[in-house]
Amino acid sequence: KAAFQKAASEALESVTSDKNASRYANDIAIVTGVSPNSIAAQVVEGLLAGGATVVATSHSFKPSIKAWAKQAYREHATGNAKLWLVPANLSSYRDVDALVDWVGHEQKKTSGATTTILKPAWEPTLFFPFAAPPVHGTLADSGDLFESQARLMLWGVERAIAGFSHIGADTNVQHKLHVVLPGSPNRGVFGGDGAYGEVKSAFDAIVNRARAE
């Protein structure tokens, strides 16, 4: 009887009593470059397990992406965790700006006299810019190829950081955006990987900018 009572008690216990299940409960996290079995996907799953509201972006809305999102939420979400899957081509500055605008503004739907709030305006607290293309090319290929890779992995990231960090700045001076950059010790050591090494080196400059600007 005691065993059954213990099992019933554990079943009724709120997940919010688990510290790990609520460690990100107050966070709005943006994770870019999500695809099944990717590092970004694992980050999303960890955030959901901590109760975060997560905006995950993918350049593709293939059935496999949607299936992953449903499974990730079903298996990992705790408490009031939410997962929004948003299409975005982050090598396009227009898409970067549109994503920032969408996150920072309330989204409504009006039907006749009824207005429904689809999502509130958010002030993101965590940003994981993991979107990246397949990288290839030697120094002899520098030019358009390197530029397209750097646009997604570096310049688009800088633009997004600037956009997200300014959301709510006029009304909440204490608000901070924590950015987790996907760094690497590979600074051109392997060769043949396009603009990868240059981009990873440039992340050091972004960190310095955070202190200086």
Predicted regions and their residues:
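Canonical Rossmann dinucleotide-binding motif of NAD(H)/NADP(H)-dependent dehydrogenases/reductases
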Residues: 14-59
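Rossmann-fold scaffold of SDR-type NAD(P)-dependent oxidoreductases
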Residues: 32, 87, 111-134, 181
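N-terminal Rossmann-fold cofactor-binding loop
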Residues: 57-62, 90
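Glycine/serine-rich phosphate-binding loop and adjoining beta1-alpha1 elements at the start
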Residues: 1-15
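Glycine-rich phosphate-binding loop and adjoining beta1-alpha1-beta2 segment
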Residues: 60-78
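Conserved Rossmann-fold cofactor-binding substructure of NAD(P)-dependent oxidoreductases
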Residues: 89-119
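Rossmann-fold cofactor-recognition segment
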Residues: 72-94, 98
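Catalytic loop of short-chain dehydrogenase/reductase
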Residues: 20, 131-213
